[in-house]
């Protein structure tokens, strides 16, 4: 069968008309140097700062240094399989993490990948880890209390929803314990908690997760962990991943608490990256933008206005000091960014005052507006009593004869210190805190021996559960003190049943 020439030309025309050229254009660069988790890449001329790039073996990186002839990229994973001459592609995306309800109760790494062995996290939404903080008009002043369940904090340095309160102290002074107790106390408060562990030992993170699980707190908590064995970029990104997961809930009108444990290790990881990228070092070898590293993170904590859904994100950043030096670079930076600090002192911790809060150096700049009326009334003189006690304590050591007023101040101070002590993982509801502090500040404990004060408190709480429920209910619902006469009578009635140890 012969094919005519015109048929051939018609077929060729048809083929030409149907031809579609699909050219895929992608920016590709070449690795010119690799080592210490940093790659220098030539040829990625249009890459953006903070953009994700993909190496030939599938490992992702993040462009941090944009220089004249090359790009400095930090590698977010194992870098042993990457070699000189390898291809690197732009992705056109910035770093994002999965967000949503499915993360609650899970332990994930800073990339949102589960590390708890419970299978994949079923989320569909993501959020960029870097996003602008709410503006001035989108915010509302802090006015709702965030009860930590720790008497010394709720009475002396109250925290409000949307506040940033720094927890600062040497290692082994109970910083993590304060945060865990605060998370445990949020049970039933419609609060979502996010615990970000930065550079912690994996065994420590495991202990924290088990504590949360034992107390039923994992039902409303997300744990983000970048352990000490992980590459520095993951330690640097962990807090931003945590706050992004929290912002998802905040913009839905919910209340979130984020704990960063701790930012000193994040700053050290960022210093490591900056020095490897050959950025000029500043004070203590930190880069010049280490202040911005923390300020852009902590500014994302906010109490949103009603128009924006009235959600809140409260931040509890930790900073570890060396030998109690709070005038070092990172501590002073974070103190100036936050709305107050809780200073934990090792001397107090080792002398048995736990939580070891130094009332003189601890302050809450906005929390006073969030304190409930009842607590405001009873704790007004507490800080002054403690300050006077610490001052007089130094003089009393010389053993000279003291007048009656001084002895009374010392006695009240010693009882105040005892009342503010608290056992680990036993947060106390605010109405019971008000009751014991009321008894203290109104002088009902002045004739109780100091060694019996803790026992008095325990038995008083049990007595209130049985005989004083109406008083506790009044404080809980009205946020104010009940009739003082009734309160005094109740305390007197309990005191009659209390047996002082011989």
From Swiss-Prot:
Q: What is its main location?
A: membrane
Q: Gene symbol?
A: atpA
Q: Name one GO cellular component term.
A: proton-transporting ATP synthase complex
Reactions catalysed, semicolon-separated, are: ATP + H2O + 4 H(+)(in) = ADP + phosphate + 5 H(+)(out)
State a single Gene Ontology molecular function: proton-transporting ATP synthase activity, rotational mechanism
Q: Where in the cell is it found?
A: Cell membrane
Q: Which Gene3D superfamilies match?
A: 2.40.30.20, ATP synthase alpha/beta chain, C-terminal domain (1.20.150.20), P-loop containing nucleotide triphosphate hydrolases (3.40.50.300)
Tell me which EC number(s) this protein carries. 7.1.2.2
Listed under subunit, the entry gives: F-type ATPases have 2 components, CF(1) - the catalytic core - and CF(0) - the membrane proton channel. CF(1) has five subunits: alpha(3), beta(3), gamma(1), delta(1), epsilon(1). CF(0) has three main subunits: a(1), b(2) and c(9-12). The alpha and beta chains form an alternating ring which encloses part of the gamma chain. CF(1) is attached to CF(0) by a central stalk formed by the gamma and epsilon chains, while a peripheral stalk is formed by the delta and b chains.
Annotated site residue numbers, Required for activity: 362
Q: Protein name, please?
A: ATP synthase subunit alpha
Say which enzyme class the record assigns: translocase
């Amino acid at each position: 069968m012969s094919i005519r020439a015109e048929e051939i030309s018609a077929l060729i025309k048809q083929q030409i008309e149907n031809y579609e050229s699909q050219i895929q254009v992608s920016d590709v660069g070449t690795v010119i140097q690799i080592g210490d988790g940093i790659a220098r890449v030539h040829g990625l001329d249009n890459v953006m700062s903070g953009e994700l790039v993909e190496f030939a073996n599938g490992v992702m990186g993040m462009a941090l240094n944009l220089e004249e002839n090359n790009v400095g990229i930090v590698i977010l994973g194992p870098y042993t399989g990457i070699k000189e001459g390898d291809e690197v592609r732009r992705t056109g995306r910035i770093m994002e993490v999965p967000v949503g309800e499915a993360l609650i109760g899970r332990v994930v790494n800073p990339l949102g990948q589960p590390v708890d062995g419970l299978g994949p996290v079923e989320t569909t939404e993501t959020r960029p880890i870097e996003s602008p903080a709410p503006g001035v008009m989108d915010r509302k002043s802090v006015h709702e209390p965030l009860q930590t369940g720790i008497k010394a904090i709720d009475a002396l340095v109250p925290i409000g929803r949307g506040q940033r309160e720094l927890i600062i102290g040497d290692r082994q002074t109970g910083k993590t314990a304060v945060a865990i107790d605060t998370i445990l106390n949020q049970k039933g408060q419609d609060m979502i908690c996010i615990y970000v562990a930065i550079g912690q030992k994996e065994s420590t993170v495991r202990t924290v997760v088990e504590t949360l699980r034992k107390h039923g707190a994992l039902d409303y908590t997300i744990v983000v962990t970048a352990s000490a064995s992980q590459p520095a970029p993951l330690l640097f990104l962990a807090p931003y991943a945590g706050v992004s997961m929290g912002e998802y809930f905040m913009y839905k009108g919910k209340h979130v608490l984020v704990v960063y444990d701790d930012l000193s290790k994040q700053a050290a990881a960022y210093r490591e990256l900056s020095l490897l990228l050959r950025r000029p070092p500043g004070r203590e070898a930190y880069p010049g933008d280490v202040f911005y590293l923390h300020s852009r993170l902590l500014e994302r904590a906010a109490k949103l206005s009603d128009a924006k859904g009235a959600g809140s994100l409260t931040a509890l950043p930790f900073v570890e000091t060396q030998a109690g030096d709070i005038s070092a670079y990172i501590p002073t930076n974070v103190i100036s960014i936050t709305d107050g600090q809780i200073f934990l002192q090792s001397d107090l911790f080792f002398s048995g005052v736990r939580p070891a809060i130094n009332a003189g150096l601890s302050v809450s700049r906005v929390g006073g507006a969030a304190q409930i009326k009842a607590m405001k009334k009873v704790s007004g003189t507490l800080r002054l009593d403690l300050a006077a006690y610490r001052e007089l304590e130094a003089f009393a050591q010389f053993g000279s004869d003291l007048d009656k007023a001084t002895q009374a101040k010392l006695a009240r101070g010693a009882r105040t210190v005892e009342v503010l002590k608290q056992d680990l993982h036993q947060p106390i509801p605010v109405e019971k805190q008000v009751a014991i502090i009321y008894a203290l500040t109104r002088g009902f404990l002045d004739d109780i021996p100091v060694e019996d004060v803790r026992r008095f408190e325990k038995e008083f709480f049990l007595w209130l559960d049985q005989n004083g429920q109406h008083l506790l209910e009044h404080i809980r619902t009205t946020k104010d003190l009940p009739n003082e006469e009734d309160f005094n009578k109740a305390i007197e009635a309990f005191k009659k049943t209390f047996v002082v140890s011989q």
